[in-house]
From Swiss-Prot:
Chain spans, region Disordered: 1-44
Annotated gene: Ccdc146
Stated name of the protein: Coiled-coil domain-containing protein 146
Sequence ranges of Acidic residues compositional bias: 10-21
Lineage of the species this protein comes from: Eukaryota, Metazoa, Chordata, Craniata, Vertebrata
Role played: Essential for sperm flagellum biogenesis and male fertility.
Subunit structure comment from the entry: Interacts with CCDC38 and CCDC42. Interacts with intraflagellar transport proteins IFT20 and IFT88.
Entry coiled-coil feature ranges: 105-160, 195-340, 421-474, 512-660, 687-712, 767-848
Main localization, broad class: cytoplasm
Keywords: Cell projection, Cilium, Coiled coil, Cytoplasm, Cytoskeleton, Differentiation, Flagellum, Phosphoprotein, Spermatogenesis
Superkingdom of origin: Eukaryota
Entry annotated with the keyword Phosphoprotein: yes
GO molecular function, one term: protein-containing complex binding
Length: 974
């Protein structure tokens, strides 16, 4: 706004100056001399005096538009993408304004130059008009008046143009000012907004101050509470440790009498149980002996029945095997007859097809033989023709050789004097010239005769020159005729070649047509054969399907027989297993009896030991009762201390709860502020996510496009490989047919029951019944031992888990302390590392600086020695060294080169900045090349224009003009 006000003030001052100038012009129009002087001063075109701001020097980041956009973006009214678009548009507009300003400045300079030229021309005209200054006539007065009125008219026109220009600029400024004025809010609204903002800021400031004070107070309270809590926690931990120790002692002492009583009860129970077991075992022994007798009787009966059943099963099995063999043989015979029938039918069909094919092949071979005989006759005729041509060419060759020999003889017969004629002619010319000179130099001749002689000499020279030119023309014409003859011969040869090619091509076309007919016939035959083979294939496939169905039925029957066999075997195994189980039961009963006897003896020994232990336990019980009384008194004291500690703990919990409530209230207030911040962050994140989604969509679409293009390329590449793929398909079909034949052969081998490789027996020996029983007993004993070990491990695990739980509680209590210590240690280690790194860096810098100082000291010493030597030489009157002179010359040369380089850079920069195109526009782009240098050795490397389609070189002549011989370009002699 300040710039705009300055701009308007300057314009008003310019307008006042112009009005004063106009008044002065009107006042001085009374006299003719004054008008003429004014006309000389006033230019014909007045340049508009508008104070245009220099846009090139403006910083875009500090413009009001950019500042306004940044404010809107920070306030959240404008998104980032929209801001970037508006900034880009503004920069484009700014660039256009700068370019228009530059063009305007150039136009103004041109206008100034033209006005100066017009003024000079007017001065010259006036001087020409004022030529007769002495004489003053009516014509001169009228001319002066006319000039005055013309000048006034031009001044009025200029003023009108100037005012119109000023008016347009002012209207534009007015529109801009109005737009800005509309954007500017009203003072009342601004005051209201400012008041509201001030009030809100004051309220927020007060609230912030209050909150800060409250936070400070709360922090102080929290610090004090934390200190108290730390003290109380330490006291509580000490008391808890003491309490845990006491509890452990109490538990340890309490568990001793309880364990003793439990052990006594266990022993009494065991005693009673063993007595009961003895009674039960005796009763079971009697029952087992009775059952053993019954089982023995049953076993004998079952053994007899088993023998009978085994005999019956073996007889039936032999019968079944015989029947199965007969059935299998019959099936084989049936299958063989069917196979023979099918093979004979297939052979008959194949023989029919082969017979037809042989007939067709015979016909084809006959046709080929007739065709080849015709070709042979044609070739024989061609051979005769070529032999005739060869004879003619040989005769022509002999004639040409004779002619050549005759010409050579004639050449030898020509005298050598004819060859020396040009030299003799030159010598005669020289003698004539000498005679002419001598004649001209003779004094006895008169002037007229001398002139005649000179004229004749000049005419003679002219005639000689014409003769030489004519001779050269004749020689050139001879050469041209020779070249034309050669071209004619070449064209005739080319014509003959093309005729021969034409004939050959016609012959090839005919032969190709015949081949095409033959291939078509073959194709028809192949199609016919394929149809026949297809019929055969269908018949074979139907037969194969029948055989497959029969095979399936046979498989079903075999499976049924196998199932029956399995059922019978299972029944046999069930009977065997029942017999084995009964034998095992008997053995187990015997083992139990022997175990019971041993257990009874061991129990008697245990009873004796328990009585001895009971006496010892009674003595221990009395000693432990005394210790129990002492521990009970200690427990009462500890319980009283525990009650006091619980009261202290409850007080500390109340304090903690109060401070927690206060902290929650403050946290809620802080959360409100954080929520506001989070809302803004979420909005920003949402927009970023949308942008990211759009970018991903674009990337995905690009990938799709690339994939489609790749697929297109792949399909385009696969098109030319079609023939090779068809060939591969044929090979694969052949392999498929071979595989099908192999599968049929394998199926036949699998169906055949007499095949040796059909069954595979498992190696090794089968165990006997006794070995199996022993193995089972061993496994049972191992299982019992493992169960005992597992029980022992479970008991140990329970005791260890109790101890570990106690240790775990203690370790969890000490975890926080160790964590804090570890954190402190880590922080201290980090600090130490940082300090060491800084120390190392400083040491490295110091060493570098020391090395630099040493180098500089060396340089200083060298310079001092050099200066000392120079001063000593100057004192002695000796000249300086040549090396110094060379160095000085190098310095001067470097300065000159640097100055030249800077001047060239500035010139290039000016050229690039102010490069003018033919249409008057300035550009910084490099000029496009309009010509190229041809890569030829014969001609000079002169630039040639590109032509209509730059930057492409003109193309060579097409294929239809290749038979024409290119003219040989003569090299330019410089």
């Amino acid at each position: 706004m300040e710039d705009r006000s300055k701009y308007i003030a300057e314009e008003s001052e310019d307008e006042e100056d112009e009005e004063q100038e106009e008044k002065e012009k009107k006042g001085g129009a009374s006299t003719s001399t004054e008008t003429e002087e004014d006309q000389e001063d006033i230019p014909s075109v007045i340049v508009p005096t508008i104070n245009i701001r220099e846009e090139r020097l403006v910083d875009l980041a500090q413009t009001p538009a950019f500042l306004c956009l940044n404010e809107l973006h920070t306030s959240g009214k404008l998104p980032g993408t929209r801001m970037a678009e508006l900034k880009a548009k503004y920069t484009l507009l700014h660039d256009t304004v700068v370019s228009t300003q530059e063009s305007e400045v150039q136009l103004l300079e041109n206008a100034k130059r033209f006005t100066e030229q017009i003024q000079q021309q007017q001065v010259r005209l006036q001087e020409a008009d004022d030529f007769p200054n002495v004489f003053t006539t009516e014509v001169s007065k009228l001319r002066e008046q006319l000039l005055k009125y013309q000048n006034e008219y031009t001044a009025v026109q200029e003023r009108e143009y100037h005012t119109q220009y000023r008016l347009n600029s002012l209207t534009e400024e007015k529109s801009l000012v109005l737009k800005e004025f509309e954007k500017i809010p009203k003072p009342g609204e601004i005051e209201k907004k400012t008041k509201l903002l001030k009030e809100s800021t004051e309220e927020l400031r007060k609230e912030v101050i209050q909150k800060r004070l409250e936070i400070k107070n709360l922090r102080e309270d929290v610090v004090s509470k934390q200190k108290q809590l730390m003290k109380e926690q330490k006291e509580l931990e000490e008391l808890m440790d003491y309490q845990v120790g006491l509890k452990d002692d109490v538990v340890h002492h309490q568990s001793v009498p309880v364990q003793i009583t439990k052990e006594i009860e266990k022993l009494t129970r065991r005693k009673i149980e063993t007595e009961k077991k003895n009674v039960v075992l005796e009763f079971e022994l009697k029952e087992l002996s009775d059952s053993l007798k019954k089982l023995e009787n049953k076993v004998s009966a079952l053994a007899e029945e088993r023998d009978d059943t085994i005999k019956e099963v073996e007889g039936k099995r032999t019968l079944l095997e015989v029947k199965e063999r007969e059935y299998g043989q019959l099936l084989k015979l049936l299958e063989l007859t069917k196979e023979n029938e099918a093979s004979s039918l297939a052979e008959r069909g194949i023989l029919d097809i082969n017979l037809r094919n042989c007939l067709m092949d015979k016909q084809n071979y006959h046709d080929e033989l007739s065709r080849k005989q015709r070709e042979k006759e044609r070739d024989f005729r061609n051979l005769k023709k070529t032999e005739l041509l060869l004879k003619v060419s040989l005769d022509a060759l002999s004639q040409a050789q004779a002619l050549n020999q005759r010409l050579l003889l004639e050449m030898e017969a020509i005298p050598k004097e004819d060859l020396l004629l040009p030299e003799q002619r030159k010598e005669l010319h020289k003698e004539v010239d000498l005679a002419k000179r001598n004649l001209a130099q003779q004094r006895s001749l008169s002037e007229a005769e001398a002139k005649l002689v000179e004229q004749q000499i000049a005419e003679e020279n002219k005639l000689l020159k014409e003769q030489e030119t004519m001779r050269e023309v004749l020689f050139n014409l001879g050469r041209m005729t020779q070249i034309k003859m050669e071209e004619k011969e070449q064209k005739a040869k080319d014509f003959l070649k093309s005729q021969r090619r034409y004939c050959d091509i016609i012959k090839e076309i005919k032969s190709k047509k015949l081949e095409i007919r033959l291939y078509r016939k073959r194709k028809r035959e192949i199609h016919r054969r394929l149809k026949e083979f297809a019929g055969l294939y269908d018949a074979i496939r139907n037969e194969r399907n029948k055989f497959v169905n029969l095979l399936h039925k046979a498989y079903q029957k075999v499976n049924e027989i196998k199932e029956r066999l399995k059922m019978s075997l299972n029944e046999l195994e069930i009977l065997r297993s029942s017999a084995v189980s009964q034998e095992r039961k008997l053995q187990n009963a015997m083992l139990k009896h022997s175990n019971n006897v041993t257990i009874r003896e061991s129990m008697q020994n245990d009873v004796c030991k328990i009585t001895a232990k009971l006496q010892e336990m009674k003595e221990k019980k009395e000693a432990q009762l005394t210790s129990m009384d002492r521990l009970a008194s200690m427990i009462t004291v500890i319980e009283e201390e525990m009650v006091q500690l619980r009261k202290k703990y409850e007080k500390a919990v109340q304090r903690r709860n109060e401070s927690g409530v206060q902290l929650i209230e403050r946290e809620e207030e802080v959360c409100i502020f954080y929520e506001k911040m989070n809302i803004q962050d979420k909005v920003k994140l949402h927009q970023d996510i949308e942008i990211h989604i759009l970018e991903e969509k674009i990337r995905f679409l690009k990938l799709k496009v690339a994939e489609k293009q790749r697929q297109i390329c792949v399909t385009q590449k696969l098109v030319p490989i079609k023939k090779s793929l068809d060939a591969n398909l044929a090979v694969v079909q052949i392999q498929f047919s071979q595989c099908a034949d192999r599968i049929k052969a394998l199926e036949k081998c699998f169906v055949n029951p007499d095949c040796q490789g059909r069954v595979r027996f498992i190696p090794g020996k089968d165990l006997t019944e006794e070995e199996m029983i022993k193995k089972l007993d061993m496994l049972e004993l191992q299982l019992a031992k493992k169960e005992e070990k597992l029980l022992e491990k479970d008991f140990i695990y329970e005791q260890v888990s109790q101890l570990t739980n106690r240790l775990k509680t203690k370790t969890q209590a000490c975890k926080m302390d160790t964590l804090l210590l570890a954190k402190k240690m880590n922080s201290y280690q980090k600090k130490i590392k940082d300090v060491t790194q800084e120390m190392m860096a400083l040491v490295a810098e110091l060493s570098m600086k020391q090395a630099l100082t040493i180098e500089l000291q060396k340089e200083v010493r060298e310079k001092e020695e050099f200066i000392f030597s120079c001063s000593s030489r100057i004192e002695k009157g000796l000249p300086l060294n040549r090396e110094i002179e060379k160095d000085w010359l190098k310095v001067l040369r470097d300065e000159e080169m640097y100055a030249f380089a800077t001047a060239e850079k500035t010139r290039e920069y000016i050229d690039t900045d102010y490069r003018q195109l033919p249409n008057g526009v300035y550009t910084t782009a490099e000029q496009r090349p309009n010509a190229y240098i041809p890569e030829t050795d014969a001609t000079l490397p002169l630039p040639k224009p590109y032509g209509a389609l730059a930057p492409f070189k003109p193309s060579e002549p097409g294929a239809n003009r290749r038979h024409i011989r290119k003219p040989i370009i003569k090299p330019i002699e410089i």
